[in-house]
Amino acid sequence: MNIEVEMKVLDERMADFIPAYATEGSAGLDLRACLDEEVVLQPGETFLVPTGLAIYLANPAYTAVLLPRSGLGHKHGIVLGNLVGLIDSDYQGELKVSLWNRGSEPFTVKPFERIAQMVIVPVVQAGFKRVEEFVGSSRGEGGFGSTGSH
């Protein structure tokens, strides 16, 4: 399934870094840091990184999800400060990525470095029906760890 997403280039330096799928099977599009200079993230610090891009999905049947790049998280402890970013279909502002250094060493974010990935996903908007009781299920109210171990 393909959809067309409107995109504005807010910083002309990013015109050479339009998000694109790396392979035919790629789910995520890389987002890059639109920085004037390097930023050093100390352990435990967060920094809101601009991308120089804005998107408008327009259709409430879709959202964009921002996720960490696996290599940054595994090798350097760099993840998203909010763990997952959610871009609503009616948002039109600049895409920004909250980076969090959960590692033990300082990490340098370089201008135009790939910092996160964006995945466009379908959304189901649910309506809620108030009930007094649920129809029984085999799980019932079993919560964390209730379905067994490893």
UniProtKB/Swiss-Prot annotation:
Necessary cofactors: Mg(2+)
Keywords: Hydrolase, Magnesium, Metal-binding, Nucleotide metabolism
Binding site for substrate: 69-71, 82, 86-88, 96
Entry's Gene Ontology molecular function annotations: dUTP diphosphatase activity; magnesium ion binding
GO biological process, one term: dUTP catabolic process
Disulfide cross-links: none
Its EC number(s): 3.6.1.23
PANTHER family noted in UniProt: DEOXYURIDINE 5'-TRIPHOSPHATE NUCLEOTIDOHYDROLASE (PTHR11241:SF0)
Stored Pfam families: dUTPase
Annotated catalysed reactions: dUTP + H2O = dUMP + diphosphate + H(+)
Family designation: Belongs to the dUTPase family.
GN (gene name): dut
Biological role: This enzyme is involved in nucleotide metabolism: it produces dUMP, the immediate precursor of thymidine nucleotides and it decreases the intracellular concentration of dUTP so that uracil cannot be incorporated into DNA.
Pathway as given in its UniProt record: Pyrimidine metabolism; dUMP biosynthesis; dUMP from dCTP (dUTP route): step 2/2
Taxon lineage: Bacteria, Pseudomonadati, Pseudomonadota, Betaproteobacteria, Neisseriales
Species the sequence originates in: Neisseria gonorrhoeae (strain NCCP11945)
Protein name: Deoxyuridine 5'-triphosphate nucleotidohydrolase
